[in-house]
Amino acid sequence: MNQNFTDHVAEAIQAAFAEAQRLNHTEVTENHLLWAFLKDKEGYFYSLLNGLGTNPQKLFQETENNIHHLPTYSGGGQAPNPSRSLQSRIVDAQNIAQSWKDTYTSSDHFLISYWKNGGDPFASWKKKTTISLEKLEEQIKKIRGDRHMDSPSSESNLQALEKYCKNLTDLARQGKLDPVIGRDEEIRRTMQVLCRRTKNNPMLIGDPGVGKTAIAEGLAQRIVQQDIPDSLKNKQLLALDMGSLIAGTKYRGEFEERLKGILQDIEKSEGQIILFIDEVHTLIGAGATDGAMDAANLLKPALARGILHCIGATTLNEYQKYIEKDAALERRFQLVLVNEPTIEDSIAILRGLRERYEIYHGVHITESAIHAAVLLSSRYITDRRLPDKAIDLIDESASLIRMQLGSRPLPIDNKERELAGLIVEQEAMKRESTPLAKNEVEKLEGRIAQIKEELKILREQWDQEKKIIESLKEKKDKLEKLRFEEEAAERKADYNRVAELRYNLIPQLQKEIEEAQTQLNNKPNRLLQEEVDESLIAQIVSKWTGIPVHKMLEGEAERLLHLENELEKRVVGQEIAVSAVSEAIRRSRSGLSDPNRPMGVFLFLGPTGVGKTELAKALAFQLFNQDEALIRLDMSEYMEKHTVSKLIGSPPGYIGYEEGGQLTEALRRRPYAVVLFDEIEKAHPDVFNILLQVFDDGRLTDSKGRVVNCKNALFIMTSNIGSDLLLEKMEQNKQGLAKDEIMLVLDPVIKKHFRPEFINRLDDILPFVPLREHDMEKIVVIQLNLLAKRLKDRDVELMWTPQALAHLAKEGYDPHFGARPLKRYIQQEVINQLSTAILEGKIPPHSHIKLELEGNTIRFKSFAGGKN
């Protein structure tokens, strides 16, 4: 027997033998083979019968019935032999293949053989159809074209466009594509390139998420609506699926054959097909194994001759990396730049998509949610592009509401938990026989009955609200279908149906939706929330970015107005610095500062221990509600030239290149942060060169060429240069100095240490004055409050007398070293005593401790269980 079968036929024969053996049949008949052909619903045999308008599924069932009634044998393990009917069927199919000048016998040869002289059940099934042999052969020739079965995989490459492409025009006709809002200029430019005589292949280039694929979908929708030039009318726009094209290509040459099949089908269409290739850079190297040609080289001749109309889409980085290197491929495409839409355009895009997301999730998306999604994503999610990031926010917020709609409302959940607890308590009380227990049982019964009644009312309300929401979802779904039907009727010029839909059915349904929405909104104390609003959008943004939700909405203005008060709770005696920093943050948040510069750039100058680093920490907490928002870089680590590259990452070829820079990576992950350069005077001069572009343009390029946005960060540098001069001046003037007087002292030192271009880029140089004696008591209170907080975790309350407070402030004061000696003094005099007493068991839980001054020593008194 000639073994030249296509892969599909070989697989069918194997499946027929395997099924016969499984059923313990003595031989493999032609019906086993027919069963194997029909079992593969994606196969060529099945699709041929389907394309003729017959019912191949019914034939499959009849064939399966037939083979299950064949005689079996009891002995296992014996391989069945091919029957005479199967052998003659194979020979007949091979003769047909030979007469058609095909090298390989394929499924269609077997189908013709069955059609000519197949036995039951095929023969009886064929009689019920009205299909002639001539019609079958015509259908085969239509699918095949001028192709012959000249390789084992030839059958797989028939109808290649249907297998490896997605028809965007069909999807647009069925209303399955999202509406494309705006982008008229880009779609017009794409059509302009497609209408050219040569190089009529547009290449859509833009950042990820700006809507390149949407432009192709918009073009498909315009083709369906006939809103295009005459030369593009009735064209088919197909999207190539590279994944399915490559998948399963085990042997060399299979991939090329599939691609050749696609190109032949496109050539056969005589210019009626436009191919859209998303992520077009994947063509470079695709399918190239052991010296085989890649997809790009196979496409070049078709692109050059104008056989293939192609729209490519890729990002600028990938275009430069892959396509620009291949000059022959590059010149066959014409670039169409797709820029990120503006805030206004993004809002319009989201308005257009709102109804689709409302219908899908069964929720209501407010106008404020759309504005919040665009504005908050634009401001806080800096590493992604509009409109993609704003659409994702709306989608995730709507899915959260939908998830909540499907679960029990909190009031019902709380009541059910309370009821379960009371029932357990009642059962326990029933075991007691005392009069008090009986009285308690009666009380519990009354409370249980009351909660059951409340639960009944709540469940009824929940059911009603669920029904209204489900009804709204169904009505909105129906409205979308009616609108789609209206468009289809208008295209077919069925104006009677258009009038009925436009002036009767659609307005009536819209009125029903409005009434249901009003009924839902007017319900008092609603259990279910089906509205996506700005607060929910802000909540999702906070989950993505880690920036607290309440820091983004109305409360922010109130908080910024009182920023000084909050900062002074942690930083004492530095009114000048606190005020200047607060003003800079208010300027930035109100939108009046330069949008292309960081939020603020400050140099804090002053002696050690006066609150420079503490103010940076306090700012991080106030602005972002967490101390983790402080990116702290100790400049003593960047004193040598070779360490400077750690800020932006090692250059290519050096160890650490893949890891990125310590500053750039931290800012990429957390663009909203306070960046603290501690002891900046110790940094190598090259560090200042890097910081110049950051302070001036709010951007920093890392070693990989990625631009990091620094516009939302607050940069603080600390230094103690000139602090000895400042201390001398303060000792001479006990009343304190104004900022101008302090700067007169520090100016010469600053100019000596820092270059003019660096000083010129600072928003302000803020002097921190040495702490005065009267500041120390406030710092003692802050330190003791922190200690009290730690003791409260052990259920111990701490108090102190004014005398103890004054003594700690006096003894811990050192103008040269700031607040740090005070912290050490409290540790020695107070914390050491308390820790020893706790370990000895002298301070049990629920104690109250009072710090008192005895002579010149701090002592504590412990009052267990109550205050003194």
From Swiss-Prot:
Homohexamer. The oligomerization is ATP-dependent. It is found in: Cytoplasm. The gene is clpB. GO terms for molecular function: ATP binding; ATP hydrolysis activity. InterPro entries: AAA+_ATPase, ATPase_AAA_core, Clp_ATPase_C, Clp_N_dom_sf, Clp_R_dom, ClpA/B, ClpA/B_CS1, ClpA/B_CS2. Residues 82-146 are annotated as: Repeat 2. The lineage of its organism: Bacteria, Pseudomonadati, Chlamydiota, Chlamydiia, Parachlamydiales. It comes from Protochlamydia amoebophila (strain UWE25). This is Chaperone protein ClpB. GO terms for cellular component: cytoplasm. The Clp repeat (R) domain probably functions as a substrate-discriminating domain, recruiting aggregated proteins to the ClpB hexamer and/or stabilizing bound proteins. The NBD2 domain is responsible for oligomerization, whereas the NBD1 domain stabilizes the hexamer probably in an ATP-dependent manner. The movement of the coiled-coil domain is essential for ClpB ability to rescue proteins from an aggregated state, probably by pulling apart large aggregated proteins, which are bound between the coiled-coils motifs of adjacent ClpB subunits in the functional hexamer.
